[in-house]
């Protein structure tokens, strides 16, 4: 920053403090309007661009889900769900569910009060499932053949019904409802030899009308739109009705409320986030020994949130977990850093017996350059995320840059200005806060304002913006305006008394923190720079070796409390389904699908899936999930009623001479598929076994001959990302072979396992691209402003060390790269460069005063070094508390951020001083 420009800014800040603070206040009030009225309703997408997402979008568009499935796992405490007690109780709860639905009482969230449950004709079993896709209706149909109902049936009769279902090839698919631990033994029942099946658990799904719920495909993950949230409210409502209070069975939802669970855990983590802010503010107050510093910083952080949300709304940034929670939490550290450096420097100058206004002038003169550079480099670090292909990351970088600018204005400039005005009032009022009574008042007031402002912040960020703003306003009035009004009143009393009593000497804070210890650490380091830098280089080399081993991994337990029903339900699913089921993936196929040879190629591809280790084969022998074009073709050729209807409708006779389930000619196949899309498929006695809506979820017939189908399959163990990668690699050769068929135009892989893999890969790529961009941009900016490439490089180099150390620790502690941990890299650059800039700028300032680098570094350590320790302590203690939050995502973020800030402090106090004395522009180049 040029000296003339800097001088003008300093004079403006110190001369027009009142108008400047007034403008900031008016701007804050103005931002309240967009904060409420222009708040985004859309969430930033966590998905990058790419084929896997394009295919998923086309699949969702071409194959609209008519039914929303809510999956559950029911487990018997007695080890067998195939008993009268469990099944009759389950049926009773289902009947209660039906009754509530008819009355519109299942509606939850913002859903309209109307019936939602639907029936489903299972094409594999040929049985109509009434609202619940479960083993209950198949068992009930067999019991009716015997002449009893579930309520009347004995254990033997139920076991007989299960045996008949499983032993019949047409209904053996009921095995897929049972636990992988299900077993059987031969027994005689009513003179019939049967297999007596015992299953500790069963899976089932409740079916609702997806169109009434807003449509859309299956979405499991944080960041859902309002329709997804409403579905989750409905899922929870259904579970409440089906839970059995008498203990006949235990019920687990299977990922039925990902967003609501995240919201609940986020709210339960709110107290820890609030404690983080409280501790940060109290440490600031302790470090500066000032109630006013605590109050100004606490209220300043609250105003910072208004600026962040208001400006974000003005420029159209979307919301999301990261923008709404992670960015505000991160800004606690950066905001505290701006405040402590500005306020600490002001107190240093004031302790030199300057008047408050002169002290402010000296402080701003000394620290403004560093604050501006910190603001610019922080912004560059965060804006480097604009290189990402992920919308949520781009909006994160933009929001963080806004917050950095707001921190600079509010806590770096306005905070010391306001403290100066308070000190002027205190001097004019002859007010001195000495004695035990004043000390107790300061401590009580500091705790009160810390708690109140933290409450306002957490309310604005996570609960209610309106209540948060009101709370912040009340906090400002109670803890800032009223004390200032008291000083004004006292000043008027003093003026009326015309008192000319001399003021006592100003109290000098000689030990705000352990200054000798900080000086000792820094000076001992700079006396042996080569040794220190050599050790740092060795540690960094080892760290890089381990850091590059970090892999992108997703596991639900990294995001949700391990004791939550979300995690327990998935654990139960793994336990009872194992390798016979898993997360669905899909192969997208587009081509001339009315060519029988194309269907034969698809059929061969489906059979080849059995040879891939990571693809599940159900207990009934199916390797695909749901319908595809080959299934529809086989249902048509197996149905004489459908064949007759097609011939009557179109004049085309369906034949299948080789009995492969595929019509012999192109004309036959096209006629069959088009009939099925319009009318469905008929079974025995002309009863419909496939509805048109079901067909439309298996085949999309295009007027231009490019038809589409999806081949769904299941992948067990996708919580281990290496399984997804291995599956993708294993299936690729088969995909290439299928696409090589002349009638197949495009083949691709999609589904949630592969979209998540792409998300993780893009998050990692963002780290790899944004990090060098931020570092290079920081070096260029600092070189231009400092007019020294050496100083700029020395300032930025410790940040590289911090990132390497941090990710090596992550690897050692068992963390993995994901959306949240990847962002910590960007935050570490922002905080690390902050610390480095303040040390470098202060050292250069002191070097101009004294020629000896040791003395210059000693002054730097006693001034800026102390401020760095205060800033770091406030953040480390606060974020360490967040590390105890029940939600693992917040806990990991808090712990790793605390570690990162500590590493940044060490790098700034130990490594950076050694670099500075090596490159110092002084006659005595080395100590």
Where are these regions (language model features)?
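Feature of extramembrane
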Residues: 1-292, 426-768, 772, 921-923
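Interfacial segments of transmembrane alpha-helices in multi-pass membrane proteins
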Residues: 14, 216, 259, 263-318, ...
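Hydrophobic alpha-helical transmembrane segments in multi-pass membrane proteins
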Residues: 19-27, 272-280, 301, 305, ...
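Hydrophobic, glycine/alanine-rich multi-pass transmembrane helices and their short helix-loop junctions
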Residues: 34, 283, 372-415, 419-425, ...
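Membrane-water interface of transmembrane alpha-helices in multipass transporters/channels
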Residues: 42-47, 290-299, 314-331, 385-401, ...
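Pore- and gate-forming transmembrane helices of large, multi-pass membrane proteins
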Residues: 261, 265-271, 338, 351-388, ...
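Short helical (or helix-break) motifs at transmembrane helix termini and adjacent helical loops
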Residues: 330-351, 371, 377-380, 408-415, ...
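C-terminal transmembrane helical bundles of large multi-pass transporters
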Residues: 706-709, 714-927
């Amino acid at each position: 920053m040029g000296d003339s420009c800097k001088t003008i800014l300093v004079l403006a800040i110190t001369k027009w403090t009142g108008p400047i603070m007034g403008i900031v206040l008016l701007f804050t009030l103005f931002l309240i309007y967009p904060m409420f009225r222009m708040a985004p309703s859309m969430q930033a997408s966590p998905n990058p661009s790419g084929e896997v997402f394009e295919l998923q979008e086309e699949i969702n568009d071409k194959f609209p889900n008519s039914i929303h499935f809510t999956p559950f796992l029911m487990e018997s405490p007695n080890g067998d769900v195939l008993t009268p007690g469990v099944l009759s109780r389950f049926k009773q709860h289902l009947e209660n569910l039906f009754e509530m639905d008819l009355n519109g009482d299942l509606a939850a969230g913002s859903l309209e009060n109307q019936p939602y449950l639907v029936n489903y004709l299972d094409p594999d079993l040929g049985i109509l499932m009434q609202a619940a896709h479960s083993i209950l209706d198949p068992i009930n149909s067999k019991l009716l053949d015997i002449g009893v109902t579930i309520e009347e049936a004995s254990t033997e009769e139920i076991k007989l019904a299960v045996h008949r279902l499983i032993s019949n090839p047409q209904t053996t698919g009921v095995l897929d409802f049972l636990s992988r631990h299900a077993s059987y033994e031969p027994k005689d029942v009513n003179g019939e030899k049967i297999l007596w099946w015992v299953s500790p658990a069963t899976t089932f799904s409740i079916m609702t009308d997806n169109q009434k719920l807003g449509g859309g495909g299956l979405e499991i993950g944080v960041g859902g739109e309002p329709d997804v949230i409403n579905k989750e409210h409905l899922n929870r409502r259904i579970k409440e009705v089906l839970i059995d209070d008498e203990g006949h069975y235990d019920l687990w939802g299977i990922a039925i409320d990902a967003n609501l669970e995240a919201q609940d855990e986020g709210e339960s983590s709110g107290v820890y986030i609030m404690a983080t802010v409280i501790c940060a503010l109290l440490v600031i107050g302790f470090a500066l020994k000032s109630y006013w510093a605590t109050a100004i910083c606490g209220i300043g952080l609250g105003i910072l949130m208004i600026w962040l949300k208001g400006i974000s709304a003005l420029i159209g940034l979307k919301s999301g977990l990261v923008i709404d929670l992670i960015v505000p939490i991160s800004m606690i550290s950066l905001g505290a850093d701006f405040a402590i450096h500005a306020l600490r420097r002001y107190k240093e100058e004031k302790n030199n017996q300057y008047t408050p206004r002169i002290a402010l002038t000296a402080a701003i003169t000394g620290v403004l350059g560093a604050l501006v550079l910190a603001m610019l480099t922080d912004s560059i670090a965060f804006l480097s995320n604009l290189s990402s292909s992920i919308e949520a990351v781009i909006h994160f970088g933009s929001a963080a840059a806004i917050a950095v600018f707001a921190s600079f204005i509010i806590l770096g400039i306005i905070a010391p200005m306001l403290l100066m005005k308070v000190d002027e009032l205190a001097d004019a009022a002859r007010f001195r806060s000495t004695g035990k009574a004043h000390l107790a008042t300061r401590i009580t007031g500091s705790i009160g304002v810390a708690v109140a402002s933290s409450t306002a912040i957490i309310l604005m960020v996570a609960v209610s913006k309106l209540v948060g703003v009101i709370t912040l306003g009340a906090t400002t009035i109670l803890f800032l305006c009223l004390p200032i009004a008291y000083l004004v009143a006292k000043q008027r009393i003093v003026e009326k008394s015309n008192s000319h009593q001399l003021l006592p000497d100003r109290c000098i804070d000689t030990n705000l923190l352990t200054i000798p210890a900080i000086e000792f650490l820094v000076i001992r380091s700079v006396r042996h720079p080569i040794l220190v830098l050599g050790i740092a280089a060795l540690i960094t080399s080892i760290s890089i070796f381990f850091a590059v081993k970090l892999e992108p991994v997703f596991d639900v337990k990294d995001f949700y409390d391990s004791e939550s029903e979300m995690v327990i339900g998935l654990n139960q699913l793994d336990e009872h389904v194992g390798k016979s089921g898993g997360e669905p993936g899909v192969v997208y196929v587009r081509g001339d699908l009315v060519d029988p040879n194309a269907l034969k190629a698809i059929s061969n591809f489906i059979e080849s899936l059995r040879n891939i280790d990571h693809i599940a084969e159900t207990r009934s022998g199916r390797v695909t999930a749901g319908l595809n074009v080959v299934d529809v073709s086989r249902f048509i050729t197996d149905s004489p009623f459908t064949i007759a209807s097609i011939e009557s409708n179109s004049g085309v006779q369906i034949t299948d001479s080789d009995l492969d389930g595929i019509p012999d000619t192109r004309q036959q196949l096209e006629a069959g598929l088009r009939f099925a899309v319009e009318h469905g498929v008929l079974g025995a006695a002309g009863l419909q076994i496939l509805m048109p809506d079901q067909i439309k979820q298996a085949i999309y017939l295009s007027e231009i001959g490019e038809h589409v189908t999806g081949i769904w399959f299941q992948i067990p163990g996708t919580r281990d990302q290496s399984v997804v990668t291995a599956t993708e690699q294993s299936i690729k050769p088969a995909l290439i072979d299928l696409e090589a068929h002349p009638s197949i135009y495009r083949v691709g892989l999609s589904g949630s396992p592969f979209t998540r893999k792409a998300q993780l890969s893009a998050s990692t790529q963002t780290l790899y691209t944004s990090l060098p961009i931020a570092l290079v941009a920081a070096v260029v900016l600092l070189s231009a402003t400092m007019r020294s490439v050496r100083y700029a490089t020395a300032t930025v180099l410790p940040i590289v060390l911090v990132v390497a150390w941090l990710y090596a620790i992550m690897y050692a502690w068992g963390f993995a790269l994901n959306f949240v941990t990847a962002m910590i890299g960007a935050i570490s650059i922002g905080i690390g460069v902050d610390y480095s800039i303040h040390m470098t700028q202060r050292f250069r300032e002191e070097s101009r005063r004294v020629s000896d680098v040791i003395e210059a570094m000693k002054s730097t350590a006693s001034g800026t070094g102390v401020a760095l320790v205060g800033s770091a302590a406030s953040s480390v203690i606060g974020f360490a508390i967040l590390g105890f939050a029940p939600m693992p995502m917040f806990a990991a973020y808090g712990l790793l951020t605390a570690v990162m800030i500590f590493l940044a402090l060490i790098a700034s106090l130990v490594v950076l001083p050694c670099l500075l004395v090596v490159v110092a522009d002084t006659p005595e180049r080395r100590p």
